[in-house]
Each structure stands twice: as C-alpha cells, then as structure tokens.
C-alpha cells in the first residue's frame, strides 16, 4: 500500500510505552543519509524509523516498513503474554526462512559477510523448519527482475556456501554468540551439508 502512513500509529505506540513506564520518541530516518552498506538491501518503498527510549542505558530500535513487500507469504496469529496478553499477526517461520535465504544469497556486502545470516540459516535447518519456495521466488523476482527455478537457486546457494570465507563469517557473528565453541564445526562443507537438509514447502 503506497499510501500507508506509519506515523498514524505513533500515538498508540507512545501511549503503550508510557503505560509501561517508558517515554519514547519516534523519528523517521532520511534514507539519503544512509551509508552504502546500510542501504544495500533497502528498497525505495521501505521507510525506516528509529524508536528510542531510556532505560539504564539508551536503547534504539530500528523499524522498517515496506509499503510494497514481495507477496506469496503466509501469516499466523500468535499469543504474546508479556507485558500482558495480546495477539499479534506475524509472518510464518517458513516465510521468514525464505527472507533469510534470500538475504544470504543475494545480499551484497562487498568485502564483508553478515555472519548472522549464516547463524540464522543454521538455526532454521537444525530446528527442521521448512522453507517456503513461493515467497522466496517472489523475493528473487522482485530483487533481480529475472525468473529463477528452485534448482537454479540451489545452485546459487551452493556456490555462496562453497566460496565464502568462513573465517569472516565467524568473525562477524562471534560478538552475538554466547558459546563460541559452537562455531568450531563451521566450515564450507558443514554449510553445504546443511543445505542438503533444507525441507521445502
């Protein structure tokens, strides 16, 4: 919806935070001021907002709103019980997995690698979550402007997994990992074998 206005939700967000004892400010970021890396995966139809509030230390949450997202995704209602019970509509895990795989294969970071994409890929496979091909296909076509079969995607994925410098992947993800020894098994071959375990839906 190109006419979507996230700003109309600001008062409700601010009020909910106030009821929890937090004073928040929400500002819209100007995409023209983004660096090359930050803007590498943002579309023209994505608006970015910063939500900031003070706790023991200052905290900022980045919110991205895509007003023209790739379709063919599924959603589900999930119950949240903190800070009080409420229902939230969210994308299903197989569709989130599709978004992660699109990022892993197509994200261009020049000389950098986003190790968190690899960590998440491992998580989805280890927990046996299926990957939604319909949504992944929509993302690929929107991003590249070209058709892509599942087998072609698997070829691109295997190429990325086989040729990426795993030490760079580990270095990027290390600050976010509680037990660094769990990365000892990481190698190109390890990720290629994980890819063989992907369940498609």
Description of each model-found segment:
Residues 4-201:
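Structured mid-to-C-terminal alpha-helical surface segments
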């Amino acid at each position: 919806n190109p006419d979507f206005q996230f700003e109309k939700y600001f008062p409700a967000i601010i009020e909910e935070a106030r009821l929890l004892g937090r004073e928040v400010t929400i500002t819209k970021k100007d995409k023209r001021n983004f660096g090359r890396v930050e803007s590498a995966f943002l579309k023209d139809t994505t608006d970015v907002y910063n939500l900031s509030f003070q706790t023991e230390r200052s905290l900022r949450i980045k919110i991205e709103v895509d007003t023209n997202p790739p379709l063919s995704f599924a959603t589900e209602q999930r119950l949240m019980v903190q800070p009080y019970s409420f229902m939230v509509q969210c994308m299903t895990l197989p569709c989130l997995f599709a978004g992660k795989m699109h990022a892993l294969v197509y994200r261009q970071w020049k000389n950098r690698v986003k190790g968190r994409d690899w960590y998440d890929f491992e998580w989805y496979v280890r927990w046996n979550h299926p990957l939604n091909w319909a949504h992944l296909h929509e993302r690929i076509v929107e991003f590249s402007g070209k058709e892509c079969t599942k087998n072609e995607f698997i070829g691109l994925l295997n190429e990325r997994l086989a040729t990426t410098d795993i030490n760079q992947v580990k270095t990027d993800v290390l600050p976010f990992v509680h037990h660094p020894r769990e990365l000892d098994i990481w190698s190109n071959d390890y990720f290629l074998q994980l890819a063989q375990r992907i369940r498609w839906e």
